[in-house]
Amino acid sequence: MLSAADFDPKPRRASVAVDVGGVIVGGGAPVVVQSMTNTDTADIDSTVAQVAALHRAGSELVRITVDRDESAAAVPKIRERLLRLGMDVPLIGDFHYIGHKLLADHPDCAEALAKYRINPGNVGFKDKKDKQFAEIIEMAIRYDKPVRIGVNWGSLDQDLLTALMDRNAEAGSPLSARQVTREAIVQSALLSAALAEEIGLPRNRIILSAKVSQVQDLIAVNSILAERSNHALHLGLTEAGMGTKGIVASSAAMGFVLQHGIGDTIRVSLTPEPNGDRTREVQVAQEILQVMGFRQFIPVVAACPGCGRTTSTVFQELAQNIQNDIRKNMPVWREKYPGVEALNVAVMGCIVNGPGESKHADIGISLPGTGETPAAPVFIDGRKALTLRGPNIAADFEALVVDYIEKRFGQRTAAE
């Protein structure tokens, strides 16, 4: 018979810890949130601004494209500018095709980066593949940098895939093409990792990723990787898409894998709207981890969805205002009020669930529904503290939330 305990998250898979510029990935450390810029890295001003925005939003690692000499030459300047802003955020260099040459020609870039990302599907072709892969690994050893061996099904090693397809065709019970492709993705990652270790890069300097664009494929390849190795794993659904579709797909895929104890760092690859905010991918990654109970980044604002009893929009506007204020203030509050991430706020729209939900929060309000008395009881630490009335209920409650934060978290120190 099943019990409630059967539905708890599986224990985290034991993986080898990797130090990425002071941020620990794997080894039981909290799952790390990372992101990627979409600026031209050679445009130093734009890249610094976007990295800074991503880091302020909560990205603990930021990946930048290093695709040509001008980009490689800009990397140490970007790093220096960020340090002057007080941002010691580890930068990951994303290399394709000519990474071996760029790292060799730009030693300052090789030193400034905290990690190198290698794609075994395009690091080199035919006879040059292993040689150019080895050159990047040797650079990582020389500069004591970790690498992510990132396999992507859109640029999968075609020689390996063809060999597996040919072997499968001769099998008595052949697998589907999709299943063979999954196996090729896994083998590409593991064979590349084995080669890197053979060259001399220790396992605690290697992170693996296997990126696909379909939810079921992400679940499959990462589950297989987790079973066959103890490398730290980077999760991400490549080409997840725009808006709701991208958020839902990433959440469904990574949520399942994380629930099974798999994954040491995540990136949500959302296609931004034209002129959209790149930090959205950071917020979604944080929310995936937070709603699943793995990490806490920001106070939770619980709000009811509304129904026929809540024809007023006051509770919706209040919930939105509080959520926006929290996000705006978190960079300061995180330093000023240690532990504020654990705060729970409830903004409810009527008497049915309002009082009960508000009692479960640290501070909550039950606004009057349609036809109810125009009064809003406020609950603090599980007890009714006061009742707000009049036209300024929303503003009064917002002030109470700030006052609660100052009193509860303001006396703490970061060491507590």
Curated annotation (Swiss-Prot):
Chain residues that bind [4Fe-4S] cluster: C304, C307, C350, E357
Protein task: Converts 2C-methyl-D-erythritol 2,4-cyclodiphosphate (ME-2,4cPP) into 1-hydroxy-2-methyl-2-(E)-butenyl 4-diphosphate.
Pathway where it operates: Isoprenoid biosynthesis; isopentenyl diphosphate biosynthesis via DXP pathway; isopentenyl diphosphate from 1-deoxy-D-xylulose 5-phosphate: step 5/6
Species assigned in the record: Rhizobium johnstonii (strain DSM 114642 / LMG 32736 / 3841) (Rhizobium leguminosarum bv. viciae)
Stored SUPFAM superfamilies: Nitrite and sulphite reductase 4Fe-4S domain-like
Protein family per UniProt: Belongs to the IspG family.
Cross-referenced NCBIfam families: ispG_gcpE (TIGR00612), PRK00366.1 (NF001540)
Cofactor: [4Fe-4S] cluster
Keywords, alphabetical: 4Fe-4S, Iron, Iron-sulfur, Isoprene biosynthesis, Metal-binding, Oxidoreductase
Pfam families referenced in this protein's UniProt entry, alphabetically: GcpE
Name used for this protein in its record: 4-hydroxy-3-methylbut-2-en-1-yl diphosphate synthase (flavodoxin)
Domain of life of the native organism: Bacteria
Entry note: cofactor: Binds 1 [4Fe-4S] cluster.
GO molecular function, one term: 4-hydroxy-3-methylbut-2-enyl-diphosphate synthase activity (flavodoxin)
Protein's GO biological process: isopentenyl diphosphate biosynthetic process, methylerythritol 4-phosphate pathway; terpenoid biosynthetic process
Enzyme class: oxidoreductase
Documented EC number(s): 1.17.7.3
InterPro entries, per database record: Dihydropteroate_synth-like_sf, IspG_bac, IspG_bac-typ, NO2/SO3_Rdtase_4Fe4S_sf
Catalysed conversion reaction: (2E)-4-hydroxy-3-methylbut-2-enyl diphosphate + oxidized [flavodoxin] + H2O + 2 H(+) = 2-C-methyl-D-erythritol 2,4-cyclic diphosphate + reduced [flavodoxin]
